[in-house]
Amino acid sequence: MSKSTAEIRQAFLDFFHSKGHQVVASSSLVPHNDPTLLFTNAGMNQFKDVFLGLDKRNYSRATTSQRCVRAGGKHNDLENVGYTARHHTFFEMLGNFSFGDYFKHDAIQFAWELLTSEKWFALPKERLWVTVYESDDEAYEIWEKEVGIPRERIIRIGDNKGAPYASDNFWQMGDTGPCGPCTEIFYDHGDHIWGGPPGSPEEDGDRYIEIWNIVFMQFNRQADGTMEPLPKPSVDTGMGLERIAAVLQHVNSNYDIDLFRTLIQAVAKVTGATDLSNKSLRVIADHIRSCAFLIADGVMPSNENRGYVLRRIIRRAVRHGNMLGAKETFFYKLVGPLIDVMGSAGEDLKRQQAQVEQVLKTEEEQFARTLERGLALLDEELAKLSGDTLDGETAFRLYDTYGFPVDLTADVCRERNIKVDEAGFEAAMEEQRRRAREASGFGADYNAMIRVDSASEFKGYDHLELNGKVTALFVDGKAVDAINAGQEAVVVLDQTPFYAESGGQVGDKGELKGANFSFVVEDTQKYGQAIGHIGKLAAGSLKVGDAVQADVDEARRARIRLNHSATHLMHAALRQVLGTHVSQKGSLVNDKVLRFDFSHNEAMKPEEIRAVEDLVNAQIRRNLPIETNIMDLEAAKAKGAMALFGEKYDERVRVLSMGDFSTELCGGTHASRTGDIGLFRIISESGTAAGVRRIEAVTGEGAITTVHADSDRLSEVAHLLKGDSNNLADKVRSVLERTRQLEKELQQLKEQAAAQESANLSSKAIDVNGVKLLVSELSGVEPKMLRTMVDDLKNQLGSTIIVLATVAEGKVSLIAGVSKDVTDRVKAGELIGMVAQQVGGKGGGRPDMAQAGGTDAAALPAALASVKGWVSAKLQ
């Protein structure tokens, strides 16, 4: 009996655990502190800093089953998903890693044992082929002489991508840095399937499938292209869980493994589909995995960056559900079946099931309102298409008006062998893309420019001033030996009281000083295990090795501590008031305000905001002790400590407790007791994305300042209304009621004036071929009164055509009315369009009534004068 996908995942982890590897949990799909990556797309992402020497772990061997998404940027598999056997937006990457521990011999032997041993995967050895980099004789000999693979099944792959070391079998992290050859293991499905061995002209067939890639990081590539051997070579491997499951379950397509069969059946059930071979079922089964796990990891549907990729995937799934005949929202109903089939890998998702389902349901409901109309428009455009390419302007209109991502439009077109003019679409999108780039958080990361080999010891929990030694200096990202007055730089110390930005808390400010120099610190950031003080040398000179006195801005730190502690209290209060679905999605803690983003699907009611505020202030009055304990990560979680979104934790963690009210993992700085906070006030609550709310609040002196400001505003209003705070509400109600009465009277007067104006105008109508034509520019008439006037004039004139215009603040307002007995010859929409075009505008409407606007008031007289000739031609 073949293993289930869940059993295969566990067997992989168990095997490497038996070989001395630390089993490390999958990291978030949102890469931690790596703005160059849209999503986590490989097992090694969470170990990138370890491979670069910027981070150290208390283990040298690791194994993971890493959740990955490839649906944007360089790795964009979206358009192929559902149409091929192995493309997915979401997949799990099984991996084993050596950080300067074992190398080629053990890596290859481990892989061979797991794949072929009867105790483990028991694959037939004769079905396995391997590739090695052309010049990697060491790996070749291990495969041939130690493992015993015949030479004809070991293939050397050279530089096949047009440049030195540009090869399928040579891996590199970037233009410079760690790199090395790799060996890949392929499984031969048999000659009943078309395809040739790797490196052959038929290698793209489905017979020989890559199941494992083992990378040997043994070089450090320099800027000039030279390769220097690494002092401690490392290993990074990746094996797609879905691919190895297909092999072990004796199927050729990933969509035929047990996991996908179960999901496809669930999709069929919620959509009412009966043909289980329908590709739309495969699309939806894939997409629920990426969408659910992305939301669980904090990504919310939006129109930019990660959120837009998520929205594209959701809408593609909804459209395929529509093709299957789904009559109601269905996508969110697949979260439960997904949790069931993912086994232990779905535990994080299960904890957030309600939130994930609500976000998916809301997004589907929003898109469903425009899906039918958008598809109808697309069908209409495709029906009248003469060539084989849909113009970019139509694709943009579908995106802009109906929310169709361009790849969804391309999906529909591809089914009819029609291409989309993507260049035209991009041209139409240029302005939006420019704005998105400006708002984007993706770009050059100053932190990534600096590599610090040394480590800094943080002593800021107990000290605000400390003597330290300069271990490194950086100017414009480059290491220097000394800096002079006026230069901006990053200063690294061996020990420091300065807190580096982390966990939402901003970095400290202050001063580094000595007898002959002063360095003003404007920010503090982490660089691997080092802490960098960013600022400017105000006086003197500073060099590596100098002793400094590090002084943190004490007053600023104190305000930050209060805000950070209040954030923890508010988080716990939100969970009590709104429910345990509340989890942190982001935060900012500085010396002026605290900002907290959290999962919740609707705006908070005023009474809920008040309840949270009251609950936090109650804990402040209790004056609870704020205590920290260092413990193992798993023990902390077992204790109920909440982990914060987007943070990376070591095996030993700092647990912060506030009496019996709040327990969280936190490395930030805090007050000693909750009473130190003094007062807590919420100043705003708003939405930032679907399913995410944001609260801004102040504490201590900042909160008192807002109380005074509110009191001052009330006093000013009371003075203006000639009242006092005791009867202020009654005074406001009285003023509002009087205002409403006056507005009503004013409207009645306007309507009377318009009726009188209509009566005066009717006498100015002229006869054109038996139809009364009235064209007039009015002054002092509000644009919104034009429709009422046209209705009155129609009643007075009988068979008639009316065009009225008015100008207000330089803008032209136009309206055309045509009596129904004339609309077979003259249509109001065409008439108003002709006039509007002449005044720099556009408009439209029904055959009997149409409105438009324009910007060229000077052209209005000529435009109105043209109406008689145009109408005469139509009535002949």
UniProtKB/Swiss-Prot annotation:
Alphabetic keyword roster: Acetylation, Aminoacyl-tRNA synthetase, ATP-binding, Cytoplasm, Ligase, Metal-binding, Nucleotide-binding, Protein biosynthesis, RNA-binding, tRNA-binding, Zinc
Any Pfam family matching the protein: tRNA_SAD
Catalytic activity, as annotated: tRNA(Ala) + L-alanine + ATP = L-alanyl-tRNA(Ala) + AMP + diphosphate
UniProt xrefs under Gene3D superfamilies: 2.40.30.130, 3.10.310.40, 3.30.54.20, 6.10.250.550, Bira Bifunctional Protein, Domain 2, Threonyl-trna Synthetase, Chain A, domain 2
A molecular function (GO) term: tRNA binding
Protein's GO biological process: alanyl-tRNA aminoacylation; negative regulation of DNA-templated transcription
Binding residues annotated for Zn(2+), in chain numbering: 564, 568, 666, 670
InterPro entries, sorted: aa-tRNA-synth_II/BPL/LPL, Ala-tRNA-lgiase_IIc, Ala-tRNA-ligase_IIc_anticod-bd, Ala-tRNA-synth_IIc_core, Ala-tRNA-synth_IIc_N, Ala-tRNA_ligase, Ala_tRNA_ligase_euk/bac, DHHA1_dom
Cofactor(s) demanded: Zn(2+)
Record bears the keyword Aminoacyl-tRNA synthetase: yes
Tagged with keyword Ligase: yes
Modified residues (N6-acetyllysine): 74
Membrane-traversing stretches: none
Gene Ontology CC annotation, any one: cytosol
Enzyme class: ligase
Family: Belongs to the class-II aminoacyl-tRNA synthetase family.
NCBIfam families: alaS
Domain notes: Consists of three domains; the N-terminal catalytic domain, the editing domain and the C-terminal C-Ala domain. The editing domain removes incorrectly charged amino acids, while the C-Ala domain, along with tRNA(Ala), serves as a bridge to cooperatively bring together the editing and aminoacylation centers thus stimulating deacylation of misacylated tRNAs.
Function: Catalyzes the attachment of alanine to tRNA(Ala) in a two-step reaction: alanine is first activated by ATP to form Ala-AMP and then transferred to the acceptor end of tRNA(Ala). Also edits incorrectly charged Ser-tRNA(Ala) and Gly-tRNA(Ala) via its editing domain.
Name this polypeptide is given: Alanine--tRNA ligase
Organism: Escherichia coli O157:H7
Gene name in the database record: alaS
